[in-house]
Swiss-Prot record:
One Pfam family of this chain: Porin_1
Signal peptide residues on this chain, from the entry's feature table: 1-19
Role this protein plays: Serves as a slightly cation selective porin.
Quaternary structure annotation from Swiss-Prot or TrEMBL: Homotrimer.
UniProt protein name: Major outer membrane protein P.IB
GO biological process, one term: monoatomic ion transmembrane transport
Family, similarity comment: Belongs to the Gram-negative porin family.
Transmembrane segments: none
Gene that encodes the chain: porB
Entry keyword Transmembrane: yes
Organism: Neisseria meningitidis serogroup B
GO CC, one annotated term: cell outer membrane
GO MF: porin activity
Amino acid sequence: MKKSLIALTLAALPVAAMADVTLYGTIKAGVETSRSVAHNGAQAASVETGTGIVDLGSKIGFKGQEDLGNGLKAIWQVEQKASIAGTDSGWGNRQSFIGLKGGFGKLRVGRLNSVLKDTGDINPWDSKSDYLGVNKIAEPEARLISVRYDSPEFAGLSGSVQYALNDNAGRHNSESYHAGFNYKNGGFFVQYGGAYKRHHRVQEDINIEKYQIHRLVSGYDNDALHASVAVQQQDAKLVEENYSHNSQTEVAATLAYRFGNVTPRVSYAHGFRGLVDSADYTNDYDQVVVGAEYDFSKRTSALVSAGWLQEGKGKNKFVSTAGGVGLRHKF
């Protein structure tokens, strides 16, 4: 009897040790096709087409926490890409961190979503192609090796600050400062995310002395309806004298409504003509994405979408169309 009790206790130890560890992830893949036409004058200068089986952002992760007493908890997460095409390698290449959580809020260090990225509900699409998601306005979003503090919520309001060091910025070699806030009241919400960078290297021959970005998102979200509008403004002062100023303002909107198991969705984005080298330049764009999800269950959904993007206007423009179908499973 005593031996049986000892054996049962020993067998339970690994289970107890892993009780606070959660395995989670998403597998999503599909087929996408696209066609892009570059115009030069009245004629098409080049046409590119493509169709392929693609991974739509699959991931796998482990997370957990430990109660340290007095309301303080240690929290951790290790998350990585898990492409069905087998093209991803390495651990912790998505959001991965260790930190502390308590009544003071949450303090983490690791590879973390930027504050700007956490306002990214304006782009809810699962896609590989840039033409099947509002990816141009989402381009500045990133995960940074950084330290981040998130405050607790007070009357629906919470805030975040984040700092990324020079030596962790990789090829960009730029320290950056980030801040934002969230406000919720019933289904209504307002989000702000901003960043400021110094000595940012874009390419080998393009260096930015100062860069800042601001995004404001507002909308309504409940179990059936999601509606959101975003405005984003970027401004960069380049080091080279002949490229002294570069700025652009962008807007986007997304609307979705759930009918039973089906959720149709539409997004629109527009980039206003920006300033490059102190002169107007045709970097404006318009983009539309439409699609729907069908839920077979709480975990498995079918995806379908179509997109259109036009960059520039007049005789010199770039027009792309795309379509895709896919399947997503969460665990």
